[in-house]
Amino acid sequence: MGIFIDKILIIMTSEICLTMTLPTKTSTLDVAAQCFLNSLVRETKDWRLTEYQPTQLIIPLGEQQALHFRVAYFSPTQHHRFEFPARLVTASGSHPVDFATLSRLIVDKLQHQLLLPATSCETFHQRVMESHAHTQQAIDARHDWAALREKALNFGEAEQALLVGHAFHPAPKSHEPFNQQEAERYLPDFAPHFPLRWFAVNKTQIAGESLHLNLQQRLTRFAAENAPQLLNELSDNQWLFPLHPWQGEYLLQQEWCQELVAKGLIKDLGEAGAPWLPTTSSRSLYCATSRDMIKFSLSVRLTNSVRTLSVKEVKRGMRLARLAQTDDWQTLQARFPTFRVMQEDGWAGLRDLHGNIMQESLFALRENLLVDQPQSQTNVLVSLTQAAPDGGDSLLVAAVKRLSDRLGITAQQAAHAWVDAYCHQVLKPLFTAEADYGLVLLAHQQNILVQMLGDLPVGLIYRDCQGSAFMPHAAGWLDTIGEAQAENVF
């Protein structure tokens, strides 16, 4: 069904709602405030919509005052659009309020209602305000973002197209303790590239696994591909160990790492080698010419948690990679030949002087399935569906419009064709893996890579194997690799 509301064309199918708007930036736009408000509307019930037009969202603050937001579009998928500024309505009248004021009023209300600690609420509000500022900084820096609508994007371009972040989070762009200079160098929002930080490490201080090569061979291959100028540092007892450059500097400030340096077990070789780009998660990096992507522990609070890996998580990747060698996996693959998983079939970390594996030093090696086709239209779903930072069409709508033009069909027909292909190419293999095999791939939009040809979905790549789990009926399958008691069975 397609209907017009003012300048908005809404195309609805059974699965996806596409909203096409004129790409005109207006003073009413605030995508960061929209994320905050949508998370509030989703998680609380103390609000209402007016029955009169134009529709208003009303959030009561007390008997004598309320916040009023003009609703541009109220979405069945909860991706609501609001016009700003909001208005504070009191018994004596109303006046516009900025985001700092409205967010403070809402936080104060929730603190009073739920009897929350004042210090926690203050920290929360500070993070909300920082995230709001970070979003605008990225939008201001990426003034060419609108040009991304004009063409099919490759993997790297789509990974760095995400400026808004989680659509249902009050502070989706938190990045403590990054300062602005660090944010611009290390976050995908600013489209940077940077080399890795390398260390020469005594092999006794390295823990890890690798499936098809032993760990020494895997790390050597990675170094040879990505920093060949450092190979003269290699020996049987000294291996090359890569780190995210920020994390490398962070580790050198930790006492356990300083002890290793003092004993000559670790030597800092500095930044070297090929440039890498941060993907949507920030801690996972991509180099088009490397056979591996790499996912690091990063001691930074991104959105709502410090992003350090655990041994349990990297072992989940190994578990899934071993399952991929079994007959049942080959059967699943034969049923869905365009469904693939970026296996995380290797990991490594540093040991302290006592032999403990230090989680803040961990990284997982992720198979780069795009090394032979880096320009293919393989796009992370969250970048396609995010609210456009300039208030115009999303990247998904842009793809549907290109599809419409190419096939000579209406936008509504193109939208139905896209969603139908998405259901067959993406949803069906994910649901079948769980229903028939007991394999759960926790496929939020950041982990779904939609492979497209001419803007139409033709395949699925799943990534982030730490988000894999199993249903009880997968026990027999897990037993074939000796993992019947795996910790991620539920």
Show where each model-derived region lies.
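A short glycine-rich, hydrophobically flanked beta-strand micro-motif that places a catalytic Asp/Glu
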Residues: 438-451
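Nucleotide/phosphate-binding site architecture used for ATP/NTP-dependent chemistry
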Residues: 14-425, 452-490
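Protein kinase catalytic-loop region centered on the HRD/HxD motif
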Residues: 432, 436
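Short C-lobe core helix of eukaryotic-like protein kinase catalytic domains
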Residues: 427-431
